[in-house]
Amino acid sequence: ELVKAKKIDASLLEGKNEKYLMTVVSAPLNGVNEALVIAGSDKRGTIYGIYELSEQIGVSPWYDWADVPVMPRQNLSMMRGSYTAGEPAVKYRGIFLNDEAPCLTGWVKHTYGTNYGDHRFYARVFELILRLRGNFMWPAMWGWSFYADDPENSKTAHEMGIIMGTSHHEPMARNHQEWVRKRSEYGAWDYASNQQVIDRFFREGMERAADTEDLITIGMRGDGDTPMGGKEGEDDKYVPRDEENMRLMEKIFRNQRHIIKEVTGKAPEKR
């Protein structure tokens, strides 16, 4: 309605990515003489505008995680006009919760009583990322499974506007713990000898992620984040097979791209 009434210039937002516009508008609604309006080109754009205002009035993005005090204010004022930070220069901006044990896992256990990161924990991380104008995260992976531990995790990411991905060791939107916990059923994490089962594992991941913004990692590592063909804890016994592994990796790439296209109906590079 504000756009139709020409109180907001839609051309400043149309076709833009994650851009917000903060502007003072006269008579935006009946009975309202003047208002500060925050509009976004998309969901994250609007979120960034809200958090920009929050930061401008004295709420640090680190108010929660670093206990930065929020200073009380009796009055707030804003100059009339429009303000925007423009579009982000980098498309994906986020963090990887790496080497999370024992510090972070212990804190989560103490705070939430769980042996995994649930949606309550991740919501606090997501808020920090958004307040820092980020949009992306790789979840912790040592003993946790973002997708399997709490079905609300992925839903919370979507609702809050966070794009999820997975690390170098977790291809096709699957957490390695999902394999580890069913190793007796699935068999070896070895594409050369167990391709059919692994392809099904990959396909299930894509089916689960098909309607999300998740950024899909492709490729494959050895079991336990070892080189292809290696075994966890036995790095000293590993014998490099570079040529063989490169041929196998090329096959994995082809098959993963085929699965992505088949499940989503989109070219892999456009997923």
Task: Name each model feature, range by range.
Residues 69-79, 142, 148-159, 183-271:
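Gly/Pro-rich turn-and-neighbor structural signature
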Residues 34-54, 122-147, 154-157:
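Amphipathic alpha-helical packing elements
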